[in-house]
């Protein structure tokens, strides 16, 4: 397997392999000879785009295989053709590769094993361990019982092996309508575990499949498919989130009762990623997309990997986030600031600096006549990132928030009658203002001190404030998309009307200016716009004649 390229220069990411209970189990399995190698898998269902929660599973499964010199499969659990699509298959492949991982061989599909799965279902019937049930879905729910009341046996439970084989063949041949028959495992309707009360393992669906076309009209259920796929692929450690803990009983039961090569895989559960204020239900995310509440699955406000990527998150920052939160069996909610901290740390090291003015206010330096070309570092601490040339001209733009006619001593920016330093340039003084008919300031007239380029005033006066600027005659117009949380409540998944719960201020669009050095900003190219935040060129809408930058994260937490 290829080794992930680590961009985030964090000492933490270069520590020895992280310790968690799963790695302790693997260490023991290898030490005792239970397994001689490590084989994991990442098995998403292609019914939506991957989200931040999947990133944790990707980093865990591929990371373990990488660290133990093992292998990790990418397998699509494609057992429900109604909800799945090749679009999702392609996006998942892209996301895994973008995160820095390579899977073993070609991608696998559960549908690759449909013939074998059918054969194992027949084997269970022949052993008297599966039967065709014709209860309606409503009747089946009634017969199933509750957590405090045992279920009841279906009247079809004691059919003969021959009858079940014939009926299952009819199911395969399309002789039953959807919902009129299913194949159930014969386990225990009185089990305290609902998953063991004769679960459905095959159902009828007349739907074309993105891999197998119209070959099948019956499809295996996830719980039946997943464990057998693991065994076929010789997976040693099948890693799932905690909601599948009870399903492990069915996982083991299926494998123990079919003729499949030993040793059998074993399932281990870990806590899923619950990120504060973040929605990870694919069904609800799909609703946001379908109702046009967001700009597709890759909207920068979405918690999808493609959305985070478009917003400006890097593979290294997401890997580092997954490393920091760790792997445990305890469910908890991770603060969103923990994710922001990872991308902020990454971009602080790797993003070149540039100047942007998002809420422009015209400045005219009355005693400055001849334009000057100033050389500025692309990064204050990394000489190897080089320098850039920026034009200083008589007319500039500064941010509206950086000027006041009157202010207290805590305001360290430009005030009428006082001085401030232009970033990497001279000290200027606000002399007078021009206002429009409504009393709004439209221009600040200034003077500059020509002896202050790169040095303090010779007379010893103190000028503490520094503000960014761009030349009004040598800058580029740009659109700035300032993103914040899509939802303001800590648990949006609990909201019934998810559309109504959207934060109306989650996207604010501004029209401003950037220095010319970013004219050819490539898709997803990140910058620190000084004193503004970390931004990246939008991968869909930004182009040389219409620059669009997305706010990735603020410069400081809580800013």
Curated annotation (Swiss-Prot):
Keywords: Aminoacyl-tRNA synthetase, ATP-binding, Cytoplasm, Ligase, Nucleotide-binding, Protein biosynthesis. GO terms for biological process: glutaminyl-tRNA aminoacylation; glutamyl-tRNA aminoacylation. Its EC number is 6.1.1.18. It holds the Pfam family tRNA-synt_1c_C. PROSITE patterns: AA_TRNA_LIGASE_I. The keyword Protein biosynthesis applies. A motif ('HIGH' region) lies at residues 44-54. It catalyses: tRNA(Gln) + L-glutamine + ATP = L-glutaminyl-tRNA(Gln) + AMP + diphosphate. SUPFAM superfamilies: Nucleotidylyl transferase (SSF52374), Ribosomal protein L25-like (SSF50715). It is found in: Cytoplasm. Its main location: cytoplasm. The keyword Endoplasmic reticulum does not apply. HAMAP family: Gln_tRNA_synth (MF_00126). Monomer. Belongs to the class-I aminoacyl-tRNA synthetase family. This is Glutamine--tRNA ligase. It comes from Actinobacillus succinogenes (strain ATCC 55618 / DSM 22257 / CCUG 43843 / 130Z).
